[in-house]
Amino acid sequence: MNPLIFIIIMFTLILGTVITMISSHWLLIWMGLEMNMFSMIPIIMMKSHPRSTEAATKYFMTQATASMLLMMGVIINLYYSGQWTIMNSLNPVTSYMMTIALAMKLGLAPFHFWVPEVTQGTQLTSGMILLTWQKLAPMTILYQIHSSLNLNLMLTLAILSILIGGWGGLNQTQLRKIMAYSSIAHMGWMTAIIMYNTSLMMLNLVIYLMMTITMFALFINSTTTTTLSLSLTWNSTPILTTMLLTTLLSLGGLPPLSGFAPKWMIIQEMTKNNMLLLPTTMAIMALLNLYFYMRLIYSTSLTMFPTTNNNKMKWKYKTQNFIPLSPTLITLSTMLIPLTPMMLILN
């Protein structure tokens, strides 16, 4: 891709998200989402391949449907209230329509089918943008309208997302699909807590973004896309593989790593609100995610992979071109747990 065109596309992508995040007018918010969507399509199609074309088509159809549903909700709300402002309380019909539209944009279950397919059809860099930056605009809208949303609908979407995110990743061998299902599960945790504590949702989002960017940065650095190629990285880049596997454990929410902190605080907050069954169910379902992360770690570092590893240990390891800020991201993705008391005070 021409560097100038790439810069314009990236600028439009960032501008679209920023417009959505700072606007209080529904028309501007919708315009920002559209800019975001149309700039993401060429990023997905950056590699000229039938899989990337298919992924871009699926992404466009899903996002266009969600945008249409969101605009329909905005128009109905305008008809009843006569106002375009986002701070205005929504009527029940509009609330349901907007929740479903934003669930489609975020990839929440049962509107999740496009996320693994689109992520698998793109390059690692495009997949990273899709699972991190593209979550910001819809989550900002949810943050602003959370008081008008239906609690039962949000909790249903959250439980389904955590369940599907765990089940879907169990039989996967492609790392991009595993990351996609992990994203669905994490979005479920954020959706569950947004109705009770928006600060916790933001904290969860920030930690999720750090862990996901770290994982993709390490995948890009080691050119790893499957569980088989991941098992072979141990021979050439053992330090990088160790960091990758530690970040995987953090992504699964294993204490004492960073990923445990948001889950711990979400369960605590929901228990304070006299909800015991729901956080217990969420914690049990999160074990599915941890299981397939542990399976990756087991096959990579503790045993030989089912196919014989013929790669010999090298006397001189590869010189890795580290992505900028990788050491910082790895540290933040794995060692934030001592700051948890401070986070609890802030919340």
Swiss-Prot record:
Pfam families: NADH_dehy_S2_C, Proton_antipo_M
Function: Core subunit of the mitochondrial membrane respiratory chain NADH dehydrogenase (Complex I) which catalyzes electron transfer from NADH through the respiratory chain, using ubiquinone as an electron acceptor. Essential for the catalytic activity and assembly of complex I.
Family affiliation: Belongs to the complex I subunit 2 family.
Alphabetical GO biological process terms: mitochondrial electron transport, NADH to ubiquinone; mitochondrial respiratory chain complex I assembly; reactive oxygen species metabolic process
Keywords: Electron transport, Membrane, Mitochondrion, Mitochondrion inner membrane, NAD, Respiratory chain, Translocase, Transmembrane, Transmembrane helix, Transport, Ubiquinone
Keyword Electron transport: yes
InterPro entries: Complex_I_Subunit_2, NADH_DH_su2_C, NADH_UbQ_OxRdtase_chain2, ND/Mrp_TM
Gene Ontology MF: a single term: NADH dehydrogenase (ubiquinone) activity
The protein's Enzyme Commission number: 7.1.1.2
Subcellular location: Mitochondrion inner membrane
One GO term describing the cellular component: respiratory chain complex I
Lineage: Eukaryota, Metazoa, Chordata, Craniata, Vertebrata
Protein name: NADH-ubiquinone oxidoreductase chain 2
Keyword NAD attached: yes
Membrane topology of the entry: Multi-pass membrane protein
Enzymatic reactions: a ubiquinone + NADH + 5 H(+)(in) = a ubiquinol + NAD(+) + 4 H(+)(out)
Subunit structure: Core subunit of respiratory chain NADH dehydrogenase (Complex I) which is composed of 45 different subunits. Interacts with TMEM242.
Taxonomic source organism: Dasypus novemcinctus
Segments crossing the lipid bilayer: 3-23, 26-46, 67-87, 96-116, 149-169, 178-198, 200-220, 239-259, 274-294, 325-345
